[in-house]
Amino acid sequence: MATRRQPLIPGWLIPGLCAAALMITVSLAAFLALWLNAPSGAWSTIWRDSYLWHVVRFSFWQAFLSAVLSVVPAVFLARALYRRRFPGRLALLRLCAMTLILPVLVAVFGILSVYGRQGWLASLWQMLGLQWTFSPYGLQGILLAHVFFNLPMASRLLLQSLESIPGEQRQLAAQLGMRGWHFFRFVEWPWLRRQIPPVAALIFMLCFASFATVLSLGGGPQATTIELAIFQALSYDYDPARAAMLALIQMVCCLALVLLSQRLSKAIAPGMTLTQGWRDPDDRLHSRLTDALLIVLALLLLLPPLVAVVVDGVNRSLPEVLAQPILWQAVWTSLRIALAAGVLCVVLTMMLLWSSRELRQRQQLFAGQTLELSGMLILAMPGIVLATGFFLLLNNSVGLPESADGIVIFTNALMAIPYALKVLENPMRDITARYGMLCQSLGIEGWSRLKIVELRALKRPLAQALAFACVLSIGDFGVVALFGNDNFRTLPFYLYQQIGSYRSQDGAVTALILLLLCFTLFTLIEKLPGRHAKTD
């Protein structure tokens, strides 16, 4: 029998249960809204809907190609970045990390400025007397944008694997005279192949659920994904039943991909070494030339679109656009949504990790993993699917709200939780390993422990998680695409309206402001803990 001294639910378990229950309830509510709105007899017609199967096949095909084109070059780029030290290397690695949170529409705008029919390369070809035939629309444009986003991320993750190789192995290989193919096969490949499957699965999942990229560069019915078909069913055809059916298909596919990614991630093992930082630079001439070529090609992929956003944004329309009240209303809307979503995301993530940490400390590993998985399962319901469920749920009950602030904030916070989990889970475990027994012996627990230990020791990870969540929210377009209107517009939604109305110069200014806002917000939040903040 439970007593006051032994409550039925321990206090340390309540935060995680509340956060997990909230996310599971929201997901179930969205799922039920989709299920109840799906036509009862429609499932039998799916097999006869040729266009629907074309959309499903294209979604898988473009995601597969994007993963291959991102991971294969990343293997060689990661090796080049590991072996070479050059001025600006740290800046390049930071740029590789920033592409993951770069607003999609900003990158698309830069890609169009470089590779479009009137872009930089087209002008260069014309000066050389050649004809520029590449079109950034359709499958090739989608692949180009996906590689721009995911190749740097894959390179960073594979570089971490190369840095995990024990220095003793590299020294032994150098003593044995291993070079080239043999060194790659026997030393580097066993470590890379552990990381490649989960990285490829993650990129495949992100590209499969891509929305803004396909919406901007799809180019027509032949290049449409499931998420874009959901958006079209709601925004243009207003067919909630078809949108619900498509959203269920999308959710099932994403759930399978999430579980596959989690399964593959278990194969990664950390490296143990007593020789930290030792590396064989492999200074043969052809190795140096090959590495330099790979690094230059990576710079040519990443820098021109970003430079194009800055150059095109400084045009004659700049003073006129800056004087428009609509622009600053969109800036304010984006900022308040991003900050609110970021704070909510970090709070929910800490609630999950707090209870998960306590469960792991009590050797209840399965329960702790299950609690953490509840935060990752939100990836099975991409933003457009979650927003569709909310749309149908509200439309069939109390009606759509005049202001979509609450829905957008809540949805963006949920979508950022997996990223915040990845940032905070290892620091939380380190804090437990260092101070867990001390806190237990001193009787420090609950709010007191949070204030005295976690909030002080986790200043930098908390700031980084908040920065990621805020910038991911400020650049989001998938959720706002459903609820945005003339009275509720964020900067990405305003940029999409400008691009759609062929106001390219105005759009260039907005893209520049959005880019500067993201980098400024990310930098300021990261510096909140101060230069001398400690994490131990």
From Swiss-Prot:
Record's keyword terms, sorted: Cell inner membrane, Cell membrane, Membrane, Repeat, Transmembrane, Transmembrane helix, Transport
Listed InterPro entries: MetI-like, MetI-like_sf, ThiP_ABC_transpt
Gene Ontology biological-process annotations: thiamine transport
Entry keyword Cell membrane: yes
Domain of life assignment: Bacteria
Parts of the chain that traverse the membrane: 16-36, 58-78, 95-115, 134-154, 199-219, 240-260, 291-311, 334-354, 373-393, 404-424, 463-483, 506-526
Localization terms from the record: Cell inner membrane
Gene Ontology cellular component list: plasma membrane
Domain ABC transmembrane type-1: 56-261, 331-525
Pfam family, one: BPD_transp_1
Annotated family: Belongs to the binding-protein-dependent transport system permease family.
Function: Part of the ABC transporter complex ThiBPQ involved in thiamine import. Probably responsible for the translocation of the substrate across the membrane. Is also involved in thiamine pyrophosphate transport.
Record's protein name: Thiamine transport system permease protein ThiP
Organism name: Salmonella typhimurium (strain LT2 / SGSC1412 / ATCC 700720)
Lineage: Bacteria, Pseudomonadati, Pseudomonadota, Gammaproteobacteria, Enterobacterales
Record gene name: thiP
